[in-house]
UniProtKB/Swiss-Prot annotation:
One of its GO terms (biological process) is 'de novo' pyrimidine nucleobase biosynthetic process. It comes from Shewanella sediminis (strain HAW-EB3). Catalyzes the decarboxylation of orotidine 5'-monophosphate (OMP) to uridine 5'-monophosphate (UMP). Substrate binds at residues 11, 33, 60-69, 120, 181, 190, 210-211. The keyword Transit peptide does not apply. Homodimer. This is Orotidine 5'-phosphate decarboxylase. The lineage of its organism: Bacteria, Pseudomonadati, Pseudomonadota, Gammaproteobacteria, Alteromonadales.
Length: 234
């Protein structure tokens, strides 16, 4: 297990509130994730504010477009200096290969590039409604194999898929898992959830955790408790 597996998901419509929360966290204990809402509201300046506080950033914009457009988008993310960014595996092999190729000039400074498989909010019935008549797990496996074929660094997946994906795709293929809730926490709108220790045991490399930390009375204490549950020193 890496020593900084926790990625705190920021979901704020108030920049000052977000920065106040960030200032209560420790960059040695977690990374941060910014998604579509916050990036649309606050743009690249928010990324700079986060970097100035020494946090690694996962820019979670889930690019999905024609290959050339997605290649340019991930290049823009690399120029911002983010630690990780993502694209939709359903964009296809050519799109994913173009995105990966666009990051080659950045060498070791390139962000990790991962693909979204099946959103953790989607059930088998939800998939059927959009014409995918296989169980979520089977569809995740198919998309994950395609992602690895394209040369990407890993996928976003439910912790329930992690064990088989890790065993079939290898230790170096990173698994980023949302839908993580500490024991006793509300599941919210996530259908397929696990606790942090369960997810790590299953093979997840990075755990995306939002409200259990960001809405806690003491966010740093909540983060520390999760660290302790994972037996992470520090």
């Amino acid at each position: 297990m890496n020593n900084k597996p926790i990625v705190v998901a920021l979901d704020f419509d108030d920049k000052n509130a977000a920065l106040q929360l960030i200032d209560r966290l420790d960059p040695q204990m977690c990374r941060l994730k910014v998604g579509k809402e916050m990036f649309t509201l606050f743009g690249p300046e928010l990324v700079k504010d986060i970097h100035s506080r020494d946090f690694d950033l996962f820019l979670d914009l889930k690019f999905h477009d024609i290959p050339n457009t997605v290649a340019k988008a991930v290049t823009a993310a690399a120029e911002l200096g983010v630690w990780m960014t993502n694209i939709h595996a359903t964009g296809g092999l050519a799109m994913m290969e173009a995105a990966k190729k666009a990051l080659v000039p950045y060498g070791k400074d390139a962000p990790l590039l991962i693909a979204v498989t099946v959103l953790t909010s989607m059930s088998d019935e939800d998939l059927k409604l959009i014409g995918i008549d296989v169980p979520a797990f089977e569809h995740v496996q198919r998309l994950a194999r395609l992602t690895q074929q394209a040369g990407l660094d890993g996928v976003v997946c439910s912790a329930h898929e992690a064990q088989l994906l890790k065993s079939s795709l290898g230790e170096s293929f990173k698994l980023v898992t949302p839908g993580i809730r500490p024991a006793g926490a509300d599941k919210g709108d996530q259908h397929r959830v696990m606790t942090p220790p369960q997810a790590i045991e299953a093979g997840s490399d990075y755990l995306v955790i939002g409200r259990p930390i960001t809405k806690a009375a003491d966010p740093l204490a909540a983060l520390t408790a999760i660290h302790q549950s994972l037996s992470i020193p520090g």
